[in-house]
Amino acid sequence: KGDAIVEVGRLEARLPRNQMIPRENMRTGDRVRAYVDHVGDTPKGRTVILSRTSPEFIKKLFELEVPEIEEGIIEIKAAARDPGARAKIAVASHDQRVDPIGTCIGMRGSRVNAVTTELSGERIDIVVWNADPAQFVVGALEPAKVRSIVMLEDSHTMEVVVDEDNLAVA
């Protein structure tokens, strides 16, 4: 089936194939970092399901790499992923003197590169959080230029138009 069984202390956890990063291969003895996605009880005992594709996983990786997140100076407000390809995280600083993007990137990219390496080369964009949904979406899609944005209140969605030549960077 392609699932991996991971020893976590005295118990075993399952990392399903669909929760692994695409094209990621694991071998016996590999050290694995993963997010505990679900813990449940079955007739055979307790089951622990791990994930390496969850947006929560990237949040936890940044907490490990960026002490300012763990200390509460910087907060990850949102995260979205296309596992193995790209991810975006939205960050906010609770201290005006601290640049949330620069802090998450680190000196010469050291912090973000450590997370990228753990995620098998997944490209990570870090954007500034904005409480205004329209402004947040415009910022999240940079460097693409947003031509128009329409908020659809009833479905809590937005229609965003960018030029076709900007589509790849959006």
What are these model-predicted stretches?
Residues 1-170:
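RNA-contacting regions in translation and RNA-metabolism proteins
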